[in-house]
């Protein structure tokens, strides 16, 4: 039984190993969350939605899977590709899930208690957040740092904590539980994620891909888990994971932000498809053919113009039809029986 996953010279075995520190950490996170949520609800301060609880539990499960046997043990001392998989899971899966599950009052109270409110205001600045994440990523994947930290349980624990902290900072401008820390512009959020996650990572991932020799002594000297898979091949696969592993989640987030932006700004209505319907004339006659056009009802069509049946109320200028009489003292126009000129139908 060990406290945390670390490099080992023992041959790899698929016999499960218990890492008590990992288990206690996950239990402590969940216990803290549910106790604080229960006390807040009992005191009437705020309630935690069921969806938020599910997100936190899912995030902790991903965190546990990335830290415990077998992935945690493989990443700590046997496979560079497993090490990189841990990094991706910490950065773009577990951490954002947990952040999305934290109620704003809970997170704000935690920062205030730890006296970190002012610090997080600075860390949430997009440029600062991007620098913190990318500097941490490059520093922890530098060969001397990786070999040093992975050699002991304490060092491996420190590396995992650094990844989680950097991931929290990365996501602050986009999904911070405290809304005042988020960026105000959806296009800004999309551009930030693209630049913060997709640019700097090219350098270390390219180094892993093009190197003809193993650059990590930890994984070069480790007993082979897959006998036909060399340390260089494992390292190259790690480079692929580092470059592309976060791409689906980051681009899915950008797409979600884009959809929300279009919905809230009205762009989806402006560029969306036109409503279709049948022309309804002032005399009540209905055209048999469906046509494309603006969604006007007979009660809302411009004076003397045909209307489209089945449209939404309020989409057009009010006319003075029998269904929408003129105000008192104003003469109501009679519907014209003359055919409409072509320019009035356009």
Segment roles from a protein language model:
Residues 1-346:
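Alpha-helical membrane segments of multi-pass proteins
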């Amino acid at each position: 039984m060990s406290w945390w996953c670390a490099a080992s010279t023992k041959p790899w075995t698929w016999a499960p190993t218990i890492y008590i520190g990992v288990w206690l950490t996950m239990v402590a996170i969940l216990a803290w969350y549910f106790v604080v949520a229960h006390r807040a609800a009992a005191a009437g301060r705020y309630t935690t939605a069921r969806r938020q609880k599910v997100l936190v539990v899912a995030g902790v499960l991903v965190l546990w899977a990335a830290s415990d046997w077998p992935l945690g043990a493989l990443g700590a001392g046997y496979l560079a590709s497993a090490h990189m998989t841990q990094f991706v899971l910490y950065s773009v899966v577990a951490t954002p899930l947990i952040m999305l599950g934290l109620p704003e009052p809970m997170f704000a109270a935690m920062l205030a208690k730890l006296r970190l409110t002012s610090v997080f205001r600075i860390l949430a600045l997009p440029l600062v957040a991007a620098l913190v994440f990318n500097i941490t990523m490059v520093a922890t994947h530098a060969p001397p740092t990786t070999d040093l930290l992975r050699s002991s349980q304490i060092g491996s624990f420190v590396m995992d904590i650094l990844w989680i902290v950097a991931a929290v900072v990365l996501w602050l401008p986009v999904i911070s539980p405290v809304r005042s820390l988020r960026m105000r512009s959806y296009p800004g959020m999309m551009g930030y994620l693209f630049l913060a996650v997709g640019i700097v990572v090219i350098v270390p991932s390219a180094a892993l891909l093009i190197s003809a020799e193993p650059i990590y002594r930890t994984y070069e000297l480790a007993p082979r888990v897959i006998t036909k898979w060399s340390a260089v091949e494992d390292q190259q696969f790690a480079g692929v994971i580092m470059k592309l592993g976060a791409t689906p989640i980051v681009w899915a987030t950008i797409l979600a932000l884009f959809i929300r932006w279009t919905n809230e700004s009205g762009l989806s209505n402006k560029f969306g498809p036109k409503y279709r319907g049948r022309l309804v004339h002032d005399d009540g006659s209905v055209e048999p053919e469906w046509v494309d056009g603006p969604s006007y009802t007979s009660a809302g069509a411009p004076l003397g113009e045909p209307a489209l049946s089945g449209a939404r109320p309020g989409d057009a200028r009010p006319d003075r039809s029998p269904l929408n009489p003129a105000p008192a003292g104003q003469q109501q126009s009679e519907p014209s029986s003359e055919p409409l000129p072509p320019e009035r139908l356009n």
